[in-house]
């Protein structure tokens, strides 16, 4: 689905600048390898948005006091790096922010306020976070995008350092995405597969079934037998 993925990346770019549209999704760019283009895409998006219009908030910070105050004056969340092996204990604010629901925002040395974030979020990941929340309410808010390319040995460093900052390049990108007619982000098959991997990572029962289903000889097995294997 190369063409679908190309279209998706264009539409993600458009979602960043059309931040008042209720996308109800956050984008998670996933790749365990480096040199895959995540950082370059983020650099392009930062150039499009302009300095001061985005915040860098890792996933683990959404459940911490005072970490969300920058959202009061930005239109986007762009995070290049999240720690590998991240355990996310609280996702209430994360889910609410993705879908534009109200949150209580605690501010340092100031009274808390009720706040609704109207922007768009993109997070870069090297592996799947381990969430305490296993519910589908979190899963349906995630658009997991596998970044399968690897440019090691053929890097074009000038693209990130210079090209994506050129005025004519930014004008072209902005013109293209603002003339695309859509109000939902598509979900290619490879993105659905990536979300399934994230679900499996966060559900020990799914992990177990993925391991044993292909090696079971019988089509029907006693549940007590499966439970003994699971233990």
Residue positions per predicted region:
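Feature primarily recognizes SF3-like P-loop helicase cores of small DNA viruses
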Residues: 1-231
């Amino acid at each position: 689905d190369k063409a679908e993925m190309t279209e998706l990346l264009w539409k993600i770019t458009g979602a960043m600048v059309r931040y008042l549209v209720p996308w109800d999704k956050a984008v998670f760019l996933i790749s365990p390898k480096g040199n895959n283009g995540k950082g370059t895409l983020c650099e392009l998006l930062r150039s499009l948005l302009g300095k001061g219009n985005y915040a860098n908030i890792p996933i683990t910070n959404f459940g911490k006091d005072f970490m969300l105050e920058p959202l009061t004056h930005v239109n986007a969340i762009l995070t290049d790096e999240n720690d590998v092996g991240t355990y996310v204990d609280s996702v209430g604010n994360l889910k609410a922010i993705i879908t534009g629901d109200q949150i209580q925002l605690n501010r340092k040395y100031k009274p808390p306020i009720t706040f609704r974030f109207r922007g768009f979020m993109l997070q870069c990941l090297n592996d799947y976070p381990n969430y305490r929340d296993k519910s589908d309410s979190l899963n349906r808010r995630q658009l997991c995008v596998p970044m399968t390319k690897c440019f090691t040995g053929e890097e074009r460093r000038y693209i990130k350092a210079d090209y994506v900052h050129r005025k004519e390049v930014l004008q072209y990108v902005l013109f293209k995405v603002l003339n695309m007619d859509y109000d939902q982000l598509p979900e290619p098959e490879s993105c659905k597969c990536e979300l399934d991997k994230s679900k499996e990572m966060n559900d020990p029962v799914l992990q177990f079934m993925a391991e044993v289903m292909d090696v079971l000889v019988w089509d029907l097995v006693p549940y007590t037998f499966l439970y003994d294997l699971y233990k």
